[in-house]
């Protein structure tokens, strides 16, 4: 998110209402203050799909209420700081409302907002009052008569964007000023009764399968009381009243004709269907399916079923290449691209290839020096809000994700998933036949094999040095550019690799997550634990090819081999003539064996 500007009167912090960053006041904001305009890409409604994040979009409407275009702030490059204002969980918690002026969207403070308060968007109270008036106009008295004392339907009420009736009901002709009011409308009017319950008219006793049908029936009684709808349909005990003879004729032709095709009409919205099966399928859209976990609503059982997977820990779909698991089948398809050799998007700076253009664009940001997002706790800078969010976890001492197989705990769920796959499920099934080392994916194995063959096809654009893998080349290039993108949050030290930063941070936190099961000794790195375990097993896998001596550590073998180099100057004990590769080893030997301290 390059060039993201946040005014001094506001600050970015972790949101209290949803994951990610939220916008907080740095000073008091008075009621009536206006901010904006909201920035985003202009899109047409038909260009949107269900996978997009609609929380970062606003409709811009014309003078007649028609949608001109959508302002989409999903792409950080085309948005501004208002994208960090989240929707209020309830109408009571809102402190901002969106209004439209011309073709611009502004955020209006609807209350005085104190310092260090998160800004939360809602809709104007006048919209709620208009909706309540509309509901009251349809209320029946206990005697079964229409109550005219509660007012008529609200006319000309404006939505939260300052335009009339922004949110249209997909099941009837009603429109509403906000999504929340529309949701209440769907629940109250289009929700089917549970069990044997039916919706009954208090005036005439007629029963209806859905509340909206009853509501339409109420309207007939109301119009009759006003002298409207003088033409009554008497077919099949229908009783529907219409305003004109032509309307009555059309109604009878569409609903009560003997033609089977004429009977394929939805009783809720009067939509015509071509077959019984299509009519049955259409009627499902008038059912509201509630998620009991998060209270989201869906218009089909299949949509609800797909949504429920997000609340489950089950990941039934596996990649057959690397065995990584996913909650949805479409996620597997998107993931498989990383295993493909076809990577048309190649970075000119580091040579790394990408299968997806958006991933390539995000990667190019890593070569930029701009870091507009700052951590309030340690002042560390980051290129993207996601990087900042991930960094904030190191300031949180809680390790909420616990492994069910062992006692290991983690701050991030993705780290836990990797731990389970590698340590407990042994997903490193791709094994090198030359050294027997195993890897999680075939692509990593292919890169590893180049270390055996000597193949080096990645060339440094600065010095011409060749490397076996793009990752090694990227790290090398940083030696030319001086780039150290991984900054320690506790000190000023920077690192060219993320692994180096992780190990360094443990020198500050004293964290030692790798514990020996034999003696409970703990280590900050897994390599340290592996080396320590050999003191219990007696294993010495590193053998000298000159004298057959074996060592538990590779560095000890390297030092030993120096003793076989005739050209290397050696430090020799003048008592026993034993040779040492380093003077400090000789000093220890003289002190321990011959009792001669260094003078």
Swiss-Prot record:
Task: Give the subcellular location.
Answer: Nucleus
Q: What is this protein called?
A: PR domain zinc finger protein 5
Q: Which SUPFAM superfamilies does the UniProt record give?
A: beta-beta-alpha zinc fingers (SSF57667), SET domain (SSF82199)
EC?
Answer: 2.1.1.-
Keyword list (alphabetical) reads: Activator, Chromatin regulator, DNA-binding, Metal-binding, Methyltransferase, Nucleus, Repeat, Repressor, S-adenosyl-L-methionine, Transcription, Transcription regulation, Transferase, Zinc, Zinc-finger
Q: Per the similarity annotation, which family is this?
A: Belongs to the class V-like SAM-binding methyltransferase superfamily.
Kindly name one Pfam family recorded for this protein: zf-C2H2
Q: What does this protein do?
A: Sequence-specific DNA-binding transcription factor. Represses transcription at least in part by recruitment of the histone methyltransferase EHMT2/G9A and histone deacetylases such as HDAC1. Regulates hematopoiesis-associated protein-coding and microRNA (miRNA) genes. May regulate the expression of proteins involved in extracellular matrix development and maintenance, connective tissue components and molecules regulating cell migration and adhesion. May cause G2/M arrest and apoptosis in cancer cells.
A GO molecular function term, named singly, is: methyltransferase activity
* Residues annotated as domain SET: 8-124
The UniProt subunit note reads as follows:
Interacts with EHMT2/G9A, GFI1 and HDAC1.
Species source reads Mus musculus
Set out the biological process GO terms recorded for this chain's protein. Answer: cellular response to leukemia inhibitory factor; chromatin organization; methylation; mitotic cell cycle; negative regulation of DNA-templated transcription; positive regulation of transcription by RNA polymerase II; regulation of extracellular matrix organization
Chain intervals annotated as zinc finger (C2H2-type) = 167-190, 199-221, 231-256, 264-286, 289-311, 317-339, 345-367, 373-395, 401-424, 430-452, 458-480, 486-508, 514-536, 542-564, 571-594
Q: Where is it mostly found?
A: nucleus
Q: Which GO terms describe its cellular component?
A: nuclear body; nucleolus; nucleus
Q: Does the keyword Phosphoprotein apply?
A: no
């Amino acid at each position: 998110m390059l060039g993201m500007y946040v005014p001094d009167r506001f600050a970015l912090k972790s949101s209290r209402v949803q994951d990610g960053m939220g916008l907080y006041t740095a000073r008091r904001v008075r009621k009536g203050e206006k901010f904006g305009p909201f920035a985003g890409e202009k899109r047409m409604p038909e260009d949107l799909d269900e996978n997009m994040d609609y929380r970062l979009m606003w409709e811009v409407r014309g003078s007649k209420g028609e949608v001109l275009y959508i302002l989409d702030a999903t792409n950080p490059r085309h948005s501004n700081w208002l994208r960090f204002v989240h929707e209020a969980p309830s109408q009571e918690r809102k402190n901002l409302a969106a209004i439209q002026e011309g073709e611009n969207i502004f955020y209006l403070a609807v209350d005085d907002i104190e310092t260090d308060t998160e800004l939360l968007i809602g809709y104007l109270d006048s919209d709620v009052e208009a909706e309540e008036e509309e509901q009251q106009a349809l209320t029946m008295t206990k005697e079964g008569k229409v109550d005219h004392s509660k007012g008529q339907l609200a006319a000309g009420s404006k939505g939260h964007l300052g335009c009339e009736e922004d949110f249209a009901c997909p099941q009837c002709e009603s429109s509403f000023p906000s999504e929340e009011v529309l949701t209440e409308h769907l629940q109250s009017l289009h929700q089917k009764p549970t069990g044997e319950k039916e919706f009954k008219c208090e005036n005439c006793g007629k029963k209806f399968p859905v509340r909206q049908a009853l509501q339409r029936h109420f309207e007939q009684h109301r119009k009759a009381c006003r002298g409207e709808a003088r033409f009554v349909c008497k077919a099949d005990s229908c009783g529907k009243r219409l305003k004109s003879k032509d309307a009555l004729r059309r109604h009878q032709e569409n609903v009560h004709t003997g033609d089977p095709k004429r009977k394929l009409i939805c009783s809720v919205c009067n939509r015509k269907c071509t077959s019984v099966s299509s009519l049955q399928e259409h009627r499902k859209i008038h059912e509201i399916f509630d998620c009991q976990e998060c209270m989201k609503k869906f218009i089909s059982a299949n949509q609800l079923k797909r949504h429920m997977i997000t609340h489950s820990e089950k990941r039934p779909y596996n990649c057959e290449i690397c065995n990584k698991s996913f909650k949805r089948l479409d996620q597997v398809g998107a993931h498989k691209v990383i295993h493909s050799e076809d990577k048309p998007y190649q970075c000119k700076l580091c040579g790394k290839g990408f299968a997806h253009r958006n991933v390539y664009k995000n990667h190019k940001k890593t070569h930029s020096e701009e870091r507009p997002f700052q951590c309030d706790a340690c002042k560390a800078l980051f290129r993207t809000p996601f990087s900042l969010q991930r960094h904030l976890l190191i300031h949180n001492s809680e390790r909420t994700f616990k492994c069910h197989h062992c006692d290991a705990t983690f701050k991030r769920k993705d780290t836990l998933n990797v731990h389970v796959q590698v340590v407990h499920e042994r997903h490193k099934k791709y094994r090198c036949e030359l050294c027997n080392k195993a890897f999680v994916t075939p692509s990593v194995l292919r890169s590893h094999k180049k270390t055996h063959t000597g193949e080096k096809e990645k060339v440094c654009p600065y010095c011409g040095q060749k490397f076996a893998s793009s990752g090694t080349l990227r790290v090398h290039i940083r030696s030319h550019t001086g780039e150290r993108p991984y900054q320690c949050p506790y000190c000023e030290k920077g690192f060219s690799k993320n692994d180096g930063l992780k190990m360094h941070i443990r020198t500050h936190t004293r964290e030692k997550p790798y514990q020996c099961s034999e003696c409970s000794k703990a280590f900050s790195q897994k390599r340290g634990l592996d080396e320590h375990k050999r003191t219990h097993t007696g294993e010495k896998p590193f053998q000298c090819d000159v004298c057959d001596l074996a060592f538990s550590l590779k560095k000890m073998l390297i030092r030993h081999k120096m003793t076989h180099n005739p050209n290397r100057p050696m430090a020799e004990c003048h008592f026993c003539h034993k040779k040492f590769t380093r003077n400090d080893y000789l000093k220890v030997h003289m002190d321990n064996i011959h009792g001669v301290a260094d003078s």
